[in-house]
A protein has these predicted regions:
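C-terminal interaction segments
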Residues: 7, 114-166
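A short, structural micro-pattern
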Residues: 33, 40, 81-83, 95, ...
Length: 166
């Protein structure tokens, strides 16, 4: 499997788009990342079910999170707010990071650095982030473990994001 993904031109168009990110056409690198997230999260589900140590290492889990969070613009596409603002999404823990979702005039964009005025900040513990994005935890349980400041409704919207084909 690794040889197959390594053999593909990472920037060529993949046979299938990453639908949960709203793409009809995706680059091979994103399709390969999507495939990795599928395998990682199924392995993690099995480990959770049989009470075995997980595979939450920075090397393995951070790429999963980074791929999952590429669904943010698609997830927020119907959420309206003032242009020139951003939502800050934090996955806390050694495997986590910060993601910035910027509201441009017509759409949401994932950006590397904050732009404009912060309107919400959502902090999700790394232990449950993958479960939120793969429908592995109910909303109430997720809400009780996350922290949102600023625009609560906007900040909590990420808890409905699905980063798998469901």
């Amino acid at each position: 499997m690794a040889e197959f993904h390594a053999s593909r031109d990472p920037y060529a168009t993949a046979p299938y788009g990453v639908s949960w990110a709203g793409e009809e056409k995706s680059a091979n690198w994103f399709d390969s990342a999507r495939e990795f997230t599928e395998r990682w999260h199924h392995q993690q589900q099995i480990r959770l079910a049989v009470d075995k140590p997980g595979i939450m290492t920075r090397e393995l889990y951070y790429p999963v999170l980074d791929c999952f969070l590429r669904a943010l613009p698609f997830t927020y596409r119907k959420v309206s707010t003032k242009p020139g603002t951003y939502a800050h999404i934090i996955v806390s823990g050694e495997c986590g990071d910060s993601w910035y979702l910027y509201r441009a005039e017509e759409s949401w964009q994932l950006v590397e650095e904050p732009i404009g005025e912060k309107i919400s900040e959502t902090t999700i513990p790394q232990e449950i982030a993958w479960r939120i994005f793969t429908k592995g935890i109910d909303r109430e349980s997720a809400l009780s473990q996350t922290k949102v400041t600023g625009d609560t409704k906007l900040g909590q919207h990420v808890l409905g994001m699905i980063s798998i084909v469901a």
